[in-house]
């Protein structure tokens, strides 16, 4: 999706929250897009027109406050008018300690949050309307700080492993991660799945896909064989196969069907942000 302003988390949340972001987009262009699988979990507050989820069971109207958990296929959300939203982008191990809920990517498309969150979403809608996104994000962070970490969680090892996965674009060996956590491979996988509802190997694939997608958006003409080498795929065919398993399209299809990003690529600040955000020094 086409994120606009990005806000850094306050120190209390910095280890478990990647960022906060705000989005405004007209209905037509928003409804052409899809949420591709991503290595983060989005806690979305809709402050604009109603949103509906397209699924195999039909259309489902979404609550104001909901979670987009880890996905393994594209997610289609449609707006009934002008789209306005703000989101907290969580690392997946932080769902339990920050939201006090479980997130299972294999069975749940989105997770509606409880009544307190829905009331808070109504308040944020008014704040955005009258005082803007910056103040709304400040209020969002304050609300999360008051409700997060209510219970004791031993996150240090899994948090460290997760950041190592991100830093390596999903290419670090699972045995090496387990060793750095001073756990056996089976213990490491069990603890990782307890907090993320996904195996570390499966999560590494999503991390790698996210970095690959970002590299293509920054430079759609980059050679796929070069990307395969950078990301540790056995060859170009392997890269395309993996990409299609998450995106339901080829890498070139994605680049050709994302006109908003073609326009954004003319903005040097956006390209610099993407390169730094995903460590894309080779995608220039």
Task: Label each residue range with its predicted role.
Residues 203-206, 233, 237:
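Conserved structured core elements
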Residues 195-196, 207-210, 246-247, 258-261:
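The DNA-recognition helices of helix-turn-helix-type DNA-binding domains
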Residues 190, 198, 202-214, 218, ...:
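Catalytic-pocket segment enriched in acidic/His residues
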Residues 45, 208-211, 238-241:
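Hydrophobic side chains within alpha-helical segments
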Residues 1-175, 179-185, 199, 216-217, ...:
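Alpha-helical bundle regulatory/interaction domains
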Residues 192-198, 241-254:
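A secondary-structure capping/hinge motif
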């Amino acid at each position: 999706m086409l994120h606009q302003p990005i806000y850094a988390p306050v120190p209390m949340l910095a280890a478990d929250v990647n960022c906060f972001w705000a989005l405004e987009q007209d209905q037509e262009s928003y409804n052409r897009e899809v949420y591709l699988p991503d290595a983060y979990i989005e806690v979305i507050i809709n402050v604009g027109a109603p949103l509906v989820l397209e699924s195999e069971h039909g259309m489902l109207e979404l609550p104001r406050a909901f979670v987009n958990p880890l996905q393994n296929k594209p997610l289609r959300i449609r707006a009934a008018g002008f789209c306005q939203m703000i989101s907290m982008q969580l690392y997946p191990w932080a769902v339990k300690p920050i939201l006090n809920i479980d997130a299972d990517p294999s069975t749940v498309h989105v997770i509606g949050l409880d009544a307190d969150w829905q009331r808070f979403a109504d308040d944020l809608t008014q704040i955005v309307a009258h005082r803007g996104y910056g103040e709304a994000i400040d209020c969002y962070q304050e609300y999360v700080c008051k409700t997060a970490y209510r219970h004791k969680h031993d996150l240090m090892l899994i948090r460290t492993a997760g950041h190592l996965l991100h830093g390596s674009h999903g290419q670090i060996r699972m045995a090496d991660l387990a060793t750095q956590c001073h756990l056996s491979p089976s213990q490491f996988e069990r603890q990782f799945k307890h907090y993320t509802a996904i195996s570390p190997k499966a999560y590494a694939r999503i991390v790698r896909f996210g970095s690959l997608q970002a590299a293509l958006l920054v430079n759609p003409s980059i050679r796929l064989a070069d990307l395969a080498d950078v990301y540790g795929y056995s060859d170009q065919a392997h890269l395309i196969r993996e990409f299609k398993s998450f995106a339901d399209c080829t890498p070139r299809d994605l680049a050709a069907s994302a006109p908003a990003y073609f326009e954004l690529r003319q903005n040097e600040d956006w390209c610099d942000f993407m390169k730094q955000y995903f460590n894309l020094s080779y995608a220039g």
